[in-house]
C-alpha cells in the first residue's frame, strides 16, 4: 500500500517544483526584458539622429500597396492605402540578453516587437510624402504602428495609413488616355549630409501592386526612381514610386459614345419623313439637338474646367454638328419647296399688274387727255357734304386662283382742271397719292457709282443650281450623312487608339 502511495506523492511533488522553477524563470525573463528596455532608453537623446556627426544615415524604404481606392480627374488626385516600412540602424539600441534567457528548444530572444508608443521614445526619421494632400493613420483597434528592434541595433518602423496624393493628369486624349501617378517619399528636414534614402531591394521594395484593381483604370506597370531635390535649404534625397495607369474605355462606350452614335443615327430618320410633315421633322431635329446637349453637359460635369480640347470633346462636338446639320437640311428643304412657290406666285402677280397698268396707259392715250399718272395704290377718298356726280371707281380682280387678295385698286384718272383747291371745295381729299419721280433727280456721279457696284456684284455672284425636286436633297442626305459619319469615326478611333 505504502509502496504505491509514496511514489505517487513523490512524482506530484517533483512536478510542482518544476512548475515553480519555470514560473520563476519566466518572471525573471520578463523582468530582464523590462530592465533591458529601460537600460536602452536610459540616457538616450531622442533629439540626435544615429551616428550624429558621422556619415549619413542610410534608411531603406519598403512599400506594400493595400488598395488603390479612387482617382479623381476633377481634383487631380488619387487615394491609396499602403504600408510604409523604414529600415535603419541605431547603435544606441543594441542589446545582449543573459544566458539565462535561453528559452530552450533552440529558441532564444534576438528581436523585440514593440507597440507604436515606443516610437515616441526613440529617434525616428521625419519622412513625409511630398505630393500628399490629406492622410490619416488607421487606429482600429489600436494605432497601426509598430517597432521591431533587433539585437544589433537594427530597427523596422512600420505603419498603415490612407493618403490622398496629387496627380497632375494630361487629359488631351481623355477617355483614351494613359496617366502616371507618383508617390514622392522624402525627408522633411534632413539633407543628404544627414540622411540618404534608398529603395530596399530596388524594385522588390514595392509589393501588392498585382493584387489591387480599379474600376476605371488598369495598372500596366510601376517603377521606382531615386532622385535629388535641390532646394534653397539644401539637397534632399527623394524616392519616387510611379504607377502607369491605362483608362478602361468600356464605361465610356456605354455611357457616352454609344448613346451619341444612336442619337446621330436617329436624326437621319427625318430624311425619310415627308417634307410637308413640318411638325414631325422639326420636333425630331430639336429633340436630337437637346439630347446631345444633355450628354455633353453630363460629361463636362465629371471633368475639371480646363482650357484645352479633349478627345471626347471632339467626338461630342462632331456628333452635335451632325444632328444640327440634319435640322438645317430640313430648313433648306422647306425653304426650297415653299420659297419656290412664293416666288412663282409673286411673279404671276407682277405680270398681271404690269398688264393692267399697260391697258390703263393705252386707254389714256386713246382718249387724248392730259392726265396725271396715279400710282397703283389704294386712294382713300374722304367724302364731304358735297359730292361730285361724275366720280367713278372700279376694282380689277388680280386673283390668280390661290385665294389671296392682291391689294391693287385702279382709280380713274383725275383731270388737270381738278386742282387741289377745287377738290377741297367739292369735298374730295386724296390721302395717299404718290407721283412718280424721275430718275433724273439722282446725281450723275452717284448713278455711275451705283452702276459700277451692280456690275461688280454680278461678277462675284455665286450661281446656285436650282433644285427642281426637293426630294433630291433628302436623297443626297440619306447617303452623305452616314458616309461622312463613318469616315469621321474611322479617323477618330484610328488616331486615338494608335496613340
From Swiss-Prot:
It is found in: Postsynaptic cell membrane; Cell membrane. Pfam families: Neur_chan_LBD, Neur_chan_memb. Keywords: Cell membrane, Chloride, Chloride channel, Disulfide bond, Glycoprotein, Ion channel, Ion transport, Ligand-gated ion channel, Membrane, Postsynaptic cell membrane, Receptor, Signal, Synapse, Transmembrane, Transmembrane helix, Transport. It comes from the Eukaryota. It is a multi-pass membrane protein. CDD domains: LGIC_ECD_GABAAR_LCCH3-like (cd19006), LGIC_TM_anion (cd19049). Glycans are attached at residues 32, 98, 106, 152. This is Gamma-aminobutyric acid receptor subunit beta. It comes from Lymnaea stagnalis.
Amino acid at each position: 500500500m505504502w509502496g504505491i502511495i509514496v511514489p505517487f506523492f513523490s512524482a506530484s511533488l517533483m512536478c510542482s517544483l518544476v512548475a515553480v522553477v519555470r514560473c520563476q524563470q519566466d518572471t525573471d525573463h520578463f523582468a530582464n526584458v523590462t530592465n533591458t528596455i529601460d537600460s536602452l532608453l536610459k540616457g538616450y537623446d531622442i533629439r540626435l539622429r544615429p551616428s550624429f556627426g558621422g556619415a549619413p544615415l542610410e534608411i531603406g524604404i519598403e512599400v506594400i500597396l493595400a488598395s488603390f481606392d479612387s482617382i479623381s480627374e476633377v481634383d487631380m488626385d488619387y487615394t491609396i492605402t499602403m504600408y510604409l516600412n523604414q529600415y535603419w540602424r541605431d547603435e544606441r539600441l543594441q542589446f545582449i540578453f543573459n544566458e539565462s534567457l535561453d528559452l530552450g528548444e533552440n529558441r532564444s530572444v534576438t528581436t523585440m516587437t514593440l507597440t507604436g508608443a515606443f516610437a515616441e521614445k526613440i529617434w525616428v526619421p521625419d519622412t513625409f510624402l511630398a505630393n500628399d494632400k490629406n492622410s490619416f493613420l488607421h487606429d482600429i483597434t489600436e494605432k497601426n504602428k509598430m517597432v521591431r528592434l533587433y539585437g544589433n541595433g537594427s530597427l523596422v518602423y512600420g505603419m498603415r495609413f490612407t493618403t490622398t496624393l496629387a496627380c497632375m493628369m494630361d487629359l488631351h486624349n481623355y477617355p483614351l488616355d494613359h496617366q502616371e501617378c507618383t508617390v514622392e517619399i522624402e525627408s522633411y528636414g534632413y539633407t543628404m549630409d544627414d540622411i540618404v534614402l534608398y529603395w530596399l531591394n530596388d524594385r522588390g521594395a514595392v509589393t501588392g501592386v498585382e493584387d489591387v484593381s480599379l474600376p476605371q483604370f488598369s495598372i500596366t506597370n510601376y517603377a521606382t526612381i531615386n532622385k535629388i531635390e535641390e532646394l534653397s535649404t539644401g539637397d534632399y534625397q527623394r524616392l519616387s514610386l510611379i504607377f502607369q495607369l491605362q483608362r478602361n474605355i468600356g464605361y465610356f462606350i456605354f455611357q457616352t459614345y454609344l448613346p451619341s452614335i444612336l442619337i446621330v443615327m436617329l436624326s437621319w430618320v427625318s430624311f425619310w419623313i415627308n417634307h410637308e410633315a413640318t411638325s414631325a421633322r422639326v420636333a425630331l431635329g430639336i429633340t436630337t439637338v437637346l439630347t446631345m446637349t444633355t450628354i455633353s453637359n453630363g460629361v463636362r460635369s465629371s471633368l475639371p474646367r480646363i482650357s484645352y480640347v479633349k478627345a471626347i470633346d471632339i467626338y461630342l462636338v462632331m456628333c452635335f454638328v451632325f444632328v444640327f446639320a440634319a435640322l438645317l437640311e430640313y430648313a433648306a428643304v422647306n425653304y426650297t419647296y415653299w420659297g419656290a412657290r412664293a416666288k412663282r406666285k409673286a411673279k404671276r402677280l407682277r405680270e398681271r399688274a404690269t398688264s393692267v397698268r399697260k391697258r390703263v396707259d393705252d386707254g389714256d392715250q386713246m382718249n387724248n387727255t392730259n392726265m396725271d399718272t396715279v400710282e397703283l395704290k389704294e386712294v382713300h377718298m374722304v367724302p364731304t357734304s358735297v359730292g361730285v356726280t361724275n366720280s367713278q371707281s372700279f376694282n380689277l380682280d388680280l386673283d390668280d386662283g390661290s385665294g389671296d387678295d392682291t391689294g391693287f385698286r385702279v382709280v380713274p384718272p383725275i383731270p388737270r382742271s381738278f386742282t387741289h383747291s377745287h377738290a377741297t371745295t367739292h369735298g374730295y381729299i386724296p390721302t395717299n397719292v404718290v407721283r412718280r419721280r424721275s430718275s433724273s433727280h439722282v446725281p450723275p456721279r452717284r448713278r455711275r457709282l451705283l452702276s459700277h457696284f451692280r456690275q461688280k456684284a454680278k461678277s462675284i455672284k455665286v450661281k446656285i443650281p436650282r433644285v427642281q425636286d426637293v426630294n433630291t436633297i433628302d436623297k443626297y442626305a440619306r447617303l452623305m450623312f452616314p458616309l461622312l459619319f463613318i469616315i469621321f469615326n474611322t479617323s477618330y478611333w484610328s488616331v486615338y487608339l494608335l496613340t
